[in-house]
Amino acid sequence: MNAGHTETVRALRIGVAGCADIALRRMLPAFAASPHTEPTAVASRSSEKARAAAETFGCAAVEGYDALLERRDVDAVYIPLPVALHAPWTERALRAGKHVLAEKPLTARAADTARLLDLARERGLVLAENYLFVHHSAYTAVRDLVDAGAIGDVRALSASFTIPPRSADDIRYRADLDGGALLDIGVYPLRLASLLLGSELRVRGAVLRHDTVRGVDLGGSALLGDPGTGVSAQLVFGMEHAYTAGWRLLGSEGSLTLDRAYSPPAGHRPVLRIERPDGTEERILPAHDQATAAVAAFAEAVRRAGQGAGQDKGRSSGDAAAVLRQAELVDAVRQAAHLVKI
């Protein structure tokens, strides 16, 4: 390369498999706005839905997901389908040679997650799970404060994510689509616990409120602990509650508290409360579009995979380990749970 020459990197061409709300409201706008990605096609079982989305974002409309995977102008596929469809369509996309960004949770079971991660690694492809909040700059601020000893030694986390009931036909109430509060909502505080407390957490107990008519859990709680340090996490989640979306991290010398912790609007400025014996401080953090940040991280992972960086040219071993660990925690909550039938 000649001195002064700047290499042009082609934008990652994205195909979107489905017209879910999060795709239309957050991810397609982020793909379109990012200099790193370009939405090239939107697929739906309904040609009408596909056309409407495609017209909005200036890309091709495709009827059916198989047709999307056959397109040569698609480098990577974003999958916002119901949870039960994540594993089969992720596998098909990987076998078609596409990188995959799948909505959380990647699958409903750890065994399926492990199998897909292995497939991605074998083929040198990126397989990512779309927890947007982990890309928000607020968590960089939190880590910096904890590392600086702002609250002393970390002792415990309490976190909740709860929402009011949805309409009766909402897919969260469909057992055949792997609905339920744990997979749709509880996964957020579980992922948060690993993010803030590390990868050694174990599930020590859980309760799930199980709707026997619809066959899904409507809410629950879980207790996690690190067997080496004794650090613990108390998590509450559900979809029959008043809205909450916050957490408190307790240390030996103070605490940190954050509300609207999982899905803040792009323009929202988070308020991080720092409580110590000498007083309370509220820091107003910068607004940050976590969807745009997630898209940039995915595009960078694909770029690095193309250059041969990371384990076996695919998703780095650390990222894959975090995805698998999350799936194992979800399985462990199910296995440990006392079911309250309602």
Swiss-Prot record:
Family in the record: Belongs to the Gfo/Idh/MocA family.
Q: What is its EC number?
A: 1.1.1.384
- Report what the protein is called: dTDP-3,4-didehydro-2,6-dideoxy-alpha-D-glucose 3-reductase
Residues annotated as binding NADP(+): C19, A20, D21, I22, A23, L24, R25, S44, R45, Y65, L81, H86, R172, D184
Tell me which residues bind substrate.
R26, Y243, S263
The enzyme's main class, written as a single word, is: oxidoreductase
What are the entry keywords?
Antibiotic biosynthesis, NADP, Oxidoreductase
Q: What terms describe the molecular function in GO for this protein?
A: nucleotide binding; oxidoreductase activity
Q: Which reaction does it catalyse?
A: dTDP-4-dehydro-2,6-dideoxy-alpha-D-glucose + NADP(+) = dTDP-3,4-didehydro-2,6-dideoxy-alpha-D-glucose + NADPH + H(+)
- Pfam families hit by this protein: GFO_IDH_MocA, GFO_IDH_MocA_C3
